């Protein structure tokens, strides 16, 4: 469905109305019956030393990608006509987040196919609902959504994914490592989109971006940001150190 929607947009078969006023309500998106959602401490650990551990790791990543699809399309539906996005930029905003959703859908498909090769599938293990809880917490503010979803949560993926790739390679799981390498490179562009649109919103609100980011993270995110940071990837995404280093533990 994500691919169909994006193709329709690019073909000029979809449009948006300038008077569009999406509801501030946010419910549970369409989901399969499984995975069963549980508190994070009850989710199977993600060690890569054995096949079961690698399946648990890939299942957790599949769940992240599944939720990231919904987050990207919710960004379009909820904020695509937001007044903090200049009118002449709204088509660009929508296209950016449709493309992100398309990428996340492809990432999910790659991971689920790899799970099938290992004799498993998405939904076979438990998962937690932290990403969608972040969507609910930021449903009323485009700046908060941009700060938390791409610039905190997705940026965290830039920090941890290279280590996952190396561990998978050491465990002899080259196919899984190759998939994560593809995802990692594309996630840099997703964080870059978040940074770009966050700066647009800051400009509309006459706010200094790093200071405003600190305020939003402290208001909408529990705890501090966790080093070590992948500053090379974050720099490539235009997420600079004055944003995240002051919030580190």
What is each model feature region?
Residues 1-249:
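Non-heme di-metal
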């Amino acid at each position: 469905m994500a691919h169909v929607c994006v193709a329709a947009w690019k073909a000029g078969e979809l449009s948006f109305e300038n008077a569009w006023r999406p509801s501030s309500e946010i419910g549970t998106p369409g989901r399969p019956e499984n995975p069963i959602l549980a508190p994070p401490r009850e989710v199977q650990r993600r060690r890569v030393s054995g096949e079961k551990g690698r399946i648990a790791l890939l299942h957790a990543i599949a769940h992240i990608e599944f939720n990231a699809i919904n987050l990207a399309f919710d960004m379009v539906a909820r904020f695509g006509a937001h007044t903090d996005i200049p009118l002449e930029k709204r088509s660009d905003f929508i296209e950016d987040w449709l493309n992100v959703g398309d990428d996340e859908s492809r990432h999910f498909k790659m991971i689920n196919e790899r799970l099938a090769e290992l004799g498993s599938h998405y939904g076979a293990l438990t998962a937690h609902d932290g990403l969608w809880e972040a969507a609910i917490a930021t449903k009323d503010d485009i700046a908060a959504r941009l700060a938390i979803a791409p610039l905190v949560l997705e940026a965290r993926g830039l920090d941890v994914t290279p280590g996952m790739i190396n561990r998978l390679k050491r465990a002899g799981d080259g196919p899984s490592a190759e998939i994560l390498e593809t995802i990692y490179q594309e996630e840099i562009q997703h964080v870059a989109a978040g940074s770009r649109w966050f700066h647009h919103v800051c400009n509309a609100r006459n706010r200094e971006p790093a200071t405003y980011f600190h305020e939003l993270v402290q208001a909408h995110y529990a705890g501090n940001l966790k080093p070590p940071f992948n500053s090379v990837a974050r720099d490539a995404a235009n997420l600079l150190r004055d944003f995240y280093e002051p919030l580190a533990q």
